[in-house]
Amino acid sequence: TPKTQYGIASCSKSFTSTIIAMLVDEGKLDYDVPIIEYFPDFKMYDEFATKECTLRDMLSHRTGLAPHDALWIDTIDRSTLWERLRYLKPMAPFRAQTLYNNTIYTLIGHIAEKITGQTWDDLIKERLFKPLGMTNSNTSADDMVKAPDYAIPYWEGKDGIVRKVDVLNVDLGGPAASINSCVED
């Protein structure tokens, strides 16, 4: 139905980048100021990248980091992921190529949290869902499965049998992939 909730996955990134754009418009952030100038504890594996990395680099997927998706799925919280960033070896030189990266988008959400003192989830709800009338959208798999109508995932096994599977919970990686919505919203 038009109200059936489903994970919009990486389309969540557009919501995160919109929150960042709002913070830039409010003068709280600048696309081209190195992250380390806002947060002295910001550290990447590469010293040059640490000194030069900006929101524009992060939003454009040009940090040189490989996706490291298992890291944001298995990490306890975003602040722990922030600390672990310094140990991730780059896959390419900084700004040399575009490497799609959920981990970096998760950290972009953490930057918004650190700047505002609000959770990313609350920022999305208050600044986007509420003003846009998105009453059937949320930021958590746990919330989605409580909804009266949500898409149930299935998987076809190697044996050809289709089976119901659990909803994948990627709440930690929310800024990259955890928004659930519906056609109506």
Describe these PLM feature segments.
Residues 1-57, 90-103, 174-177:
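Short active-site loop at a secondary-structure junction
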Residues 46-185:
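Short, surface-exposed loop or secondary-structure junction motifs
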